[in-house]
Amino acid sequence: MDPLANIKNEINLMNHRISSFATYVNYQLLEFKQSMSNIELMLQENIESKKKTKTDTEPNSPTKPLSTSIPTTTTAATSQSITSTSLSSSSSLSNQIAQPPIINGQVLNSSILTPTSRKKLSLVDIDKNNYNNYNNNNNNNNNNNNNNNNNNNNNNNNNNNNNNNVTTTDKKEGEKNENENENENENENENENENDIIEEDKIIEKMDEELENEQVEPVEQVKPKTQGGRKKVSKLTLDFGIGKRPVRTKTLTQLGIALEKEDTPKKRQRK
């Protein structure tokens, strides 16, 4: 079976259960309304009986004034109106209860919903009465789905047969076209590779020409300046990598370099 058919069947089952639960709730509400109407009737009968007893005892009591006596016509009229309304409501309720609900286009058994039976309606009762019909409908649907699947399989087989009946000329033409496309792609790749090689050769030639045209300037060798003649060189010297040159103390003091002076004996002061 198709998964869609299973999903549809599950949806139908859920709808059936929901509808059955709704009928159960409606029936319970109708029973509640009927019980309330019966209670109202009982209360009205009690009130009327009390009123009758009062009217019977009123003429015997001499102390009660006449102005306080309630006329019986109004009570009778009100009681008749109340009873008529209650009867009409009860009759309407009985008519509503007598009409069985319809689920999935099928009428439920009226014996369950009759007020005389006083049988409590449950989901089990509804399922018992309607589950067979529901199963029959599901079986019919499943049979229809199976028939549709068989038809689809037949159509698929026919399509496969039609596909198998493709002529050999079409296959050969397809193979020729594929071979031609492969050859064209190979030729294009070869041409692209040749063009790339030619461009690289041109670039290399240009670079060689530029290197040849460039003139290398000779580097002048800078000779260190030498002092001419012999001069006394002080002991304090600095090495700058070129040679030892005499350095005056003033420049060193200006640079902030600490000098280590030799311990010279102090001159003797004359007395």
Swiss-Prot record:
Residues 180-199, 207-217 have a biased composition (Acidic residues). Residues 169-179 have a biased composition (Basic and acidic residues). It comes from the Eukaryota. Residues 50-93, 128-233 are annotated as: Disordered. Residues 61-93, 129-165 have a biased composition (Low complexity). This is Putative uncharacterized protein DDB_G0292438. The lineage of its organism: Eukaryota, Amoebozoa, Evosea, Eumycetozoa, Dictyostelia.
